[in-house]
Structure formats: C-alpha cells, structure tokens
Curated annotation (Swiss-Prot):
<protein>
    <recommendedName>
        <fullName>Putative uncharacterized protein YPR203W</fullName>
    </recommendedName>
</protein>
<comment type="similarity">
    <text>Belongs to the helicase family. Yeast subtelomeric Y' repeat subfamily.</text>
</comment>
<dbReference type="InterPro" id="IPR050978">
    <property type="entry name" value="Y'_ATP-dependent_helicase"/>
</dbReference>
C-alpha cells in the first residue's frame, strides 16, 4: 500500500514544500532576510535600536513598519550594499535609496 510520502515522489511533503517555496520566493525574500539579520551592523540603522540598557537590540516593529510598504529591492543595488555591510563600508546614499521613500 502506498503511503502519502511515496505519493510525493518519495520525499516527505514538508521537504518538498520547502524546496518549492524557496525556488518560488527565495529570490525576493533573500535580500530582506539579509538586511534584517545584519541591520545592526549598518550605521544608518542606529536610529532603529531599541533603548534597552546594556543590550544592542533592533526595534523590529518600527523597522518593519518603515520597510514593508516599499517597492521590491533591485538585486543589483542590494548586492553591493550586502557586500559593503560585510566589509564594514556601508554607504549612506545606497542604503537610503533602498530603504527610504523617494
């Protein structure tokens, strides 16, 4: 008797769904995830740090409110920002271009 796992090409349904979700949405989701994971490394985002004594934490609600309604980020600009963040050379103009309204 065939099980549901056998029915889904021999792979567990969750793994199959994860792969298809990554293929479909990964391209658009990756820049946003990278920015959220490394936001505290950008000098421009010091305004988004929550005021907690002794802790370096990002005010995610305020950040989400400011970033979510924006247009999709163009990868060619964003890849340079990611590279600059990793090299600790964030450029204010590019970050503002991506994250702030025109």
């Amino acid at each position: 008797m065939r099980t549901f796992t056998d029915f889904v090409s021999g792979a567990p349904i969750v793994r199959s769904l994860q792969k298809s979700t990554i293929r479909k949405y990964g391209y658009n989701l990756a820049p946003h995830m990278f920015l959220l994971l490394h936001v505290d490394e950008l000098s421009i985002f010091s305004a988004y740090q929550a005021s907690l004594p002794g802790e370096k934490k990002v005010d995610t609600e305020r950040l989400k409110r400011d970033l979510c309604p924006r247009k999709p980020i163009e990868i060619k600009y964003f890849s340079q920002i990611c590279n600059d963040m990793m090299n600790k050379k964030d450029r204010l103009g590019d970050v503002l271009h991506v994250c702030c309204p025109s």
